[in-house]
């Protein structure tokens, strides 16, 4: 009678993984990694639950397969990251090399240009002074030449950015027009179409009688 009760009690047990009754041989699920993986199949599995040996073997096989796939994906990600880092470092080195080449060329160009003779503001000022001294040594009686010389001296005393050319300051150049600032009305008597002429003032009548008549007509009495 006791054996019959024990057999019926064993038949009512279920495997912790599947929906079938527990079959012999069976064992307890104590590995924490397998328990964590088995919780993906059944969230109610706990450590120490009974499981069929065949189900345990299948669970271990699936866990190892999943672990191998995870390792393979991790290695692929690390390889892709290393390739990206190498390509980024190569591109940065390629970009830095032309910049160094260009800077070297610019420095060489600056050195050669300075050796070839670059005109500094001091040299330009000295050249202007020498030219002005040469022109001062030449005797002249022209008022335009004297004014031009004075403007050249004043131009040397200011900053290079504020200096004006002699063509803009001297009035004796070929492009100078004494009537350039005059309007058309002053030059040839013409006017623009939107500007009406100013009417002339009516002459004042000195005759008192005529003035009274005029005021009576304008003021009404």
Swiss-Prot record:
Annotated compartments: Nucleus; Chromosome; Chromosome, Telomere
A GO CC term assigned to this protein in UniProt: nucleus
UniProt biased composition (Low complexity): 86-103
Region (Disordered): 69-113
Keywords: Chromosome, Nucleus, Telomere
One of the GO BP terms on file: CENP-A containing chromatin assembly
Complex formation: Component of the HipHop-HOAP telomere-capping complex, composed of at least HipHop and cav/HOAP, and may include Su(var)205/HP1; HipHop and cav/HOAP, but not Su(var)205, are interdependent for their protein stability. Interacts (via N-terminus) with cav/HOAP and Su(var)205/HP1. The HipHop-HOAP complex recruits the MTV complex, consisting of moi/modigliani, tea and ver/verrocchio, to telomeres to form the terminin telomere-capping complex.
Function: Part of the HipHop-HOAP complex that recruits the MTV complex to form the terminin telomere-capping complex, which binds to chromosome ends in a sequence-independent manner and prevents telomere fusion.
Name recorded for this polypeptide: HP1-HOAP-interacting protein
